[in-house]
């Protein structure tokens, strides 16, 4: 994975087509192995496209299940559902995101006032800790915008339990530098490693596990392999899933944002799009490589939207929508949702309505619901057909 990754719908479909042969049992058997940045990853690396919905979760699953028996692709399908689970969980626990921002600010204050902590932090970010593997992953993150999922878990565990650094500062580092940095997946994954998501059950990076799944490349010493999990005084409250907004009929302005860049498939009802605007809301302090990727993905979506709806499509400026009602895809908790204009109508995809209600607790609820969700999609009259190989409306 490199900084020059092409973020477009066409590139996403091409990447998906090339990844399909690796989504069967071979994926389940090899996905935990990190062979390093110079080797093709053992995972599919579809996440930068899924994060911006240049690919839709349901179309990826449909495509995979059209190529493999469900039993052969079960592990891959579950991993796609993890992404939807995290989004639904943060949507029903928004105080986690608010608290994360508070902890980032608190952590930065500690860095400014505690020289010892600041030195450990700076060494960790620069890859100067002397911990084998960790320093390599720090460099890989900054230079490529990518880490294998298992490396992310090891890195986070070492950051929290061996280096004793604030977990929120590590999550912030990832969100600013990862090309697939997703507010929900990133924040909740760091909380899971810390033992906050599944309370009292942290993920512990063990030297032997690292040696095994890096095929002997790394064998770190000095890791804390018996840490106490982090804790919170008050668990975050579960809130009802907010309802989508009623859609107007007639002419509308469509607002695109970085959480959903597939306007061709949005369920817009009788609304007729006559103007399209693109809203760029990067993670605060995002690396230049991430900003460029976001901008390229948005530019591609605007071109496609203009072709699909036959109207102007450009980045938003003041007064871009005129007197038209503004319609937008549902923006889950994160930077885009925080800057949506007041009064815009949010439309939510059927996929999210199927998955998110089961995401209020642990992943097991979603996992148990997978067969029903897939069957419901198959039976729904409006289920989206496969779109692989097409760059226009499905």
Please provide the spans of the model-predicted regions.
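Trp/Phe/Arg-rich N-terminal binding region typifying the photolyase-homology
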Residues: 2-17, 21-78, 82, 87-88, ...
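Active-site-proximal binding-pocket segments
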Residues: 50, 55-58, 63, 69-247
């Amino acid at each position: 994975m490199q900084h020059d990754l092409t973020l477009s719908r066409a590139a996403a479909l091409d990447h998906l087509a090339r990844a399909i042969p690796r989504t069967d049992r071979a994926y389940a058997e090899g996905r935990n192995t990190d062979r390093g940045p110079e080797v093709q990853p053992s995972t599919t690396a579809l996440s930068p496209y899924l994060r911006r919905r240049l690919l839709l979760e349901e179309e990826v699953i449909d495509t995979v299940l059209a190529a493999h028996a469900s039993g052969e692709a079960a592990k891959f399908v579950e991993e796609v559902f993890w992404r939807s689970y995290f989004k639904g969980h943060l949507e029903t626990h928004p105080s986690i995101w608010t608290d994360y921002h508070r902890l980032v600010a608190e952590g930065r204050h500690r860095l400014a006032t505690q020289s010892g902590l600041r030195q450990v932090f700076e060494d960790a970010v620069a890859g100067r800790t002397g911990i084998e593997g960790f320093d390599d992953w720090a460099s890989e993150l900054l230079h490529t915008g990518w880490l294998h999922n298992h490396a992310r878990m090891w890195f986070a565990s070492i950051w929290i339990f061996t280096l004793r650094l604030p977990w929120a500062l590590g999550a912030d580092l990832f969100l600013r530098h990862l090309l697939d940095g997703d507010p929900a997946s990133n924040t909740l994954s760091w909380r899971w490693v810390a033992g906050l998501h599944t309370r009292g059950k942290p993920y512990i990076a063990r030297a032997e596990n690292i040696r095994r799944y890096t095929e002997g490349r790394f064998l770190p010493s000095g890791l804390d392999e018996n840490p106490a999990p982090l804790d919170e005084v008050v668990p975050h409250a579960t809130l009802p899933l907010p309802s989508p907004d009623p859609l107007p009929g007639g002419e509308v302005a469509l607002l695109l944002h970085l959480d959903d860049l597939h306007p061709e498939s949005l369920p817009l009802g009788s609304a007729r799009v006559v103007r399209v605007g693109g809203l760029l809301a990067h993670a605060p302090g995002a690396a230049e490589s991430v900003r460029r990727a976001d901008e390229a993905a948005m530019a591609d979506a605007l071109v496609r939207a203009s072709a699909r709806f036959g109207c102007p499509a450009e980045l938003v400026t003041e007064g871009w929508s005129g007197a038209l009602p503004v319609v937008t895809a549902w923006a889950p908790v994160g930077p885009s949702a925080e800057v949506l204009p007041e009064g815009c109508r949010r439309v939510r995809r059927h996929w999210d309505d199927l998955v998110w209600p089961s995401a209020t607790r642990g992943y097991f609820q979603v996992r148990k619901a997978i067969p029903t969700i897939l069957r419901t999609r198959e039976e729904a009259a409006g289920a989206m057909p496969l779109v692989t190989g097409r760059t226009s409306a499905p």
